[in-house]
Amino acid sequence: MAERGAHITTTSPLDDRPSIFEVVAQESLMAAARPALHHIVKVLAESNPARYGTLWRWFDELYTLLECLLQQHYLSWASASFSENFYGLKRVTLGKQVGQRNLARKEYWKSLLLLVLIPYLRIKLEKLVNSLREEEDYSIQNPTSFHKRCYKAILASYPFLKLGWEAWFLFYQLRYILWNGKHHSPLLRLAGVQLARLTMEDLRAMEKQEELTNTVSNVVSISQHIRSILKKALGAVTLSVSSSLSLGVFFLQFLDWWYSAENRETLKSLGNLPVPPPPIHFDLETYSPLLPKLRTVCPLCRKVRVNDTALGTSGYVFCYRCAYYYVKTHQRCPVSGYPTELQHLIKLYTPDG
């Protein structure tokens, strides 16, 4: 029994097939980079919404563009993604010719699209589903509308779609472990490549290629010279980004621990301070005619509030439906005018129900 499972943790010197621990480690590296950068941008946006609000709203698109530049650089230089190259792995075209080190053009573009596009679409789909669930919980959409039926179909099919996606990846990983499969991920199979370890010949070829790109011929045309400058600038940007990511790899583990649930509870217990006294309220009518005289009335619809919801940026309370639509449309508090996003809506539960 032990002999049959020995190949899971050990490899022969002649076998360049990486172990399951190597491929899982390189996948978790890029998976940890996005949440860490996302949290940094969130802190910056909350501290200065006017300056970093755009960066927060377009984080997914900017991160995808940055990742595209990074992966393009490593695929063209090392025939591997950033995380694969970090763990000493490379992508090999299935059935490649002897002596061919770089990826073929077809496999290169398929690898780049699958590395960049699939995570972006998955993040967008998860955000869409979470938004639809929130709108359905508070009955924001019209129940008789055509869009409502489409939303219900998406919400009903998403769990099965996610289950099938995860089962698809699990099947490939089990086949890679137990039956010596060539691919641990179906995305590699779709790209027409497989992972292998870097050899000394690969490292020497990468160094030689880097030297050739640094030496530019003196006799070139103007268009070639401009193209070379742009290529060098793009390479410098991607190299600086990759170097920064390499230095921050081990810092990501610290961030993962720092913002974990267990550590958050510990910090909360250490930082328990007495509740400050309530602020002194002046005559609200002198500076905000939008506020009603009765505290139980919503400032937007002028009716008794339903599903009390406060805005974390200003503290004013509205109906959930009124606050949701207003903040989604104007991105600010209707009373104070402070910049506000949907994540600043805080649902209140009163003792009287």
Swiss-Prot record:
The chain crosses the membrane at residues 20-47, 52-76, 105-134, 140-178, 244-271. Residues 48-51, 135-139, 272-353 are cytoplasmic. GO terms for biological process: protein import into peroxisome matrix; protein monoubiquitination. GO terms for molecular function: ubiquitin-protein transferase activity; zinc ion binding. GO terms for cellular component: peroxisomal importomer complex; peroxisomal membrane. Residues 1-19, 77-104, 179-243 are peroxisomal matrix. Zn(2+) binds at residues 298, 301, 319, 322. Keywords: Membrane, Metal-binding, Peroxisome, Protein transport, Transmembrane, Transmembrane helix, Transport, Ubl conjugation pathway, Zinc, Zinc-finger. Pathway: Protein modification; protein ubiquitination. Belongs to the pex2/pex10/pex12 family. Component of the PEX2-PEX10-PEX12 retrotranslocation channel. The three subunits of the retrotranslocation channel (PEX2, PEX10 and PEX12) coassemble in the membrane into a channel with an open 10 Angstrom pore. The RING-type zinc-fingers that catalyze PEX5 receptor ubiquitination are positioned above the pore on the cytosolic side of the complex. Component of a retrotranslocation channel required for peroxisome organization by mediating export of the PEX5 receptor from peroxisomes to the cytosol, thereby promoting PEX5 recycling. The retrotranslocation channel is composed of PEX2, PEX10 and PEX12; each subunit contributing transmembrane segments that coassemble into an open channel that specifically allows the passage of PEX5 through the peroxisomal membrane. PEX12 also regulates PEX5 recycling by activating the E3 ubiquitin-protein ligase activity of PEX10. This is Peroxisome assembly protein 12-B. It comes from Xenopus laevis.
